[in-house]
Amino acid sequence: METKQCPDMECDVVIAGCGVAGLYAALNLPTSTRVIMLSKGAVDECDSMLAQGGICVLPEGSDYDAFFEDTMHAGHYDNRRESVDIMIRSSRSVINDLLAMGVDFERKADGSLDFTREGAHSRPRIAFHADITGKEITTKLLQAVRKLDNVQILEHVAMTDILTGERDGATACLGVVAVPVDEDNSVRPADELANAAEGVHAGEPFKIHARHTLWATGGIGGVYDHSTNYPQLTGDACYIAQEHGIKMEHLDYVQIHPTGLFSPQPGRTFLISESCRGEGAILLNAAGERFTDELQPRDVVTAAIREQMKQDGTEHEWLSFAPVERDVVTGHFANIRARCLEDGRDILDEPIPVTPTQHYFMGGVWVDKDGRTSMPELYAAGETACNGVHGKNRLASNSLLEALVWGRRAAWHMRTGQSLAVEQAGEPALDGRHRALSADTLAIDDLARAAGTQAVEE
């Protein structure tokens, strides 16, 4: 029997990953750019969908120094200072762009954005949508991408390698090798392949030739027994980078979140958002006693919980919502409450068992301020990449912001060959009308319109 060969595919940009970094990059490319996006699982099975707490934003110019210091302090001052500066000064234009796409952040009575606070933040600066901020943002970005005729999404397709060749006298990335996979990451049967391109056969590797390649494959939680990540996130880009000698950085910088909902069973752990502690929830030991300051950086709180578990001889400690106003619990933390009710615990009336669990990868494939890796024509953004913004320990709610900032910067550099300018820290604050405040928002105005939206009014 003759074996069918999958035809090669061609595009201008191939994006491995459909989280916020990949989606936002696609939206910031011209509609004349042919884009293919790969999702290793279903398109909504990305860690961006799971982000609960919110997304940081510079609420006013006077907060710049404090925001910078909070990020550096959480990262043990091992952060790349240029990256921290870029992220903070890009934050308001990103938020305004999300608002233009219909992202529904919580607001005060006067119509201005409401901000919450989380651990290691010196003030409230986190925009949020209940306790499902990541889902709200990712869903709106995905809706915008699906309106684009120039973007094709292939679900249940994994990147297994990159294509390389000479370009401008150097070895460059010329695309990727991919293969359709099943939900357990095994090769998919031919009759079950969903959303495949015409001529691509299940189980057979195929090539996607592209001018530019963006890695946005997420983290590494799938290699851990207990993680808040989806199991298919197994650090694929890092393995491929190692095989090709692509520069990586800080592979030992792995964040353990203090409060995963305890379960003795292996698999994905449900995250209990840090914003719960930001709103007043407290940690208790087996004797019902508070034992630490809950608003310290994540690694510090994790260490305190582990030490208390050792003293108590337990596999978990307890998180109590007793100090939190009941309407905040039922409103802000409705999703968390519903999940805990599935385990027979109502956070309105009793504490819940929590334990540290793998959550985030600060290291990864080294990139510069424009998302460029050490290999020409290969970019990376989001948890896959290490731009140094988080240092040794990520500040709460900086992950979505970082992914969006570098997804956009990578797209801009692909498009123009130049770095995207950022606003000055002293610009006016976001107000109730959510004005567009920065030069880079204006610069992507045409891209937003191309995505079926319009920029926030100037």
Positions of the model-derived regions?
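Glycine- and aromatic-enriched mobile tails/lids
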Residues: M1-C11, V20, N28, A42-D44, ...
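Extreme N-terminal leader/targeting segments of oxidoreductases
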Residues: M1-V13, P30-S32, R188-L193, G199
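N-terminal Rossmann-like FAD-binding beta1-loop-alpha1 element of flavoenzymes
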Residues: V13-M37
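Short hydrophobic core segments
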Residues: V14-A16, I208-G218, A380
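Conserved N-terminal glycine-rich FAD pyrophosphate-binding loop of Rossmann-like flavoproteins
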Residues: G41-M72, H76, Q255-P258, P266-F270
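An anion/pyrophosphate-binding glycine-rich loop and adjacent beta-alpha core
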Residues: V43, I240, I246-I352, H413-S419, ...
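Conserved redox-cofactor binding core of oxidoreductases
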Residues: A100-V187, G203-E204, H209, A216, ...
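Glycine-rich loop(s) and the adjacent beta-strand/alpha-helix scaffold that form part
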Residues: H212-P266, F270, N398-W406, W412
